[in-house]
């Protein structure tokens, strides 16, 4: 993914978070990924790491309409997924 794409996605996420009144940490730890698939508009995610521990993580996640997060696993890690705005569809199998 190009650095310009990463910067655009971070700006878009920041604008969304701020427009909904969510205060970001002073120096956010951003993760921007296309999951190695080369198509960040379809498969991507923008995250701010708020807490990272061996068995727990807390992240503020930003996605967009029609965006898919591919199936993945975490060995012994708890995640709470809370949709603060918009709609979230989770498929389990």
Question: Model-flagged regions — what are they?
Answer:
Residues 64-65, 76-93:
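Glycine- and acidic-residue-biased ligand/ion/polar-headgroup-sensing regions
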Residues 48-52, 59-61, 69-74, 82:
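Short histidine-centered beta-strand/loop micro-motifs
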Residues 1-56:
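A short, N-terminal "cap"/entry segment at the start of jelly-roll beta-barrel domains
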């Amino acid at each position: 993914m190009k650095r310009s794409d990463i910067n655009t996605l971070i700006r878009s996420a920041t604008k969304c978070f701020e427009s909904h009144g969510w205060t970001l940490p002073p120096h956010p730890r951003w993760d921007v990924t296309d999951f190695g698939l080369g198509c960040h508009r379809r498969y991507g995610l923008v995250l701010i790491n708020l807490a990272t521990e061996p068995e727990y993580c807390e992240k503020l996640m930003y996605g967009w309409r029609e965006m898919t997060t591919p199936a993945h696993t975490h060995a012994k890690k708890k995640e709470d997924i809370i949709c603060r705005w918009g709609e979230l569809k989770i498929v389990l199998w």
